[in-house]
Amino acid sequence: MVTNDKGAVSIKHAVMEGLARELWEHDEITPDAENQLIMSISPGPHATWRCCVYKEREILRWRIRLSENLDASPYATEPNPNVVQVIDPACEECPLSTYSVTDNCRLCLGKACQNSCRFGAITMTESRAHIDPNKCKECGMCANACPYGAIAHLERPCRKPCPVNAISYDENGICQIDDKKCIRCGQCIHSCPFGAIASKIDVLDVIRDIKAGKEVFAMCAPAIEGQFGKDITMGSIREALKEVGFTDMVEVGLGGDMTAAYEAEEWSEARKEGKKMTTSC
């Protein structure tokens, strides 16, 4: 499956694996260990996934903080309550959402785009139509009217999938997340091609609890069985997790079955009384 976040996920996994190994073997993660991890992922002298090694290493520093369940920014003066956070140095400051005329424009006689615009934002040049971004209200009427489909809606990948319009941008074009609107769905995380949005991770806290001798139960969705090949079963996954240090594994589908049973009883009573009720997923 082709996705926007394949490169970012591989870097995330490299950071998480390095930190987990360090904590498991040495009981703590020192600044020196963090620097060694950064240099192992971005050794230089040439950059491999961003413009320069210095940018790569700064991005890794922010990612390490998120992997340690800390706020991404080491320079923040106030705590960030959101688990979904922006890695500022990774943000490419993509062009803001706008409608743009492409080479498909034939400068036709009908000028449906211009006639459909209620704000006078479209004029004609010698080669194509032109949209004035200062007048455009992004209503999309011109794009719908063009018979050639020559007008494209260029929208930032992080903002496009957000169902609650929680993403905006500062004066420099850096992505900002409105914590009051954000529902932590993670759509922006997977949509950003530069991996500039990520979430806090509590894997290291789990490792600390296991090493401290606490009872820690792994809760796995039934779908986990399909991620490791046909010869891997829920039973083998359970044994592997217990070998790692978990007390036991519980399939969350069991909780779903229990919920369905309780809801069936609740619905039966509601039906007798002529009431309506919703169900969980």
Each predicted region: which residue ranges?
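Glycine- and small hydrophobic-enriched segments that form the cores of compact globular domains
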Residues: V101-G186, H190, G195, K200-D202, ...
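Ferredoxin-type iron-sulfur electron-transfer modules and their immediate structural context
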Residues: M1-A145, G149-R159, N165
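Iron-sulfur-associated redox domains of electron-transfer enzymes in respiratory
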Residues: M1-R63, S67-N69, S199-C281
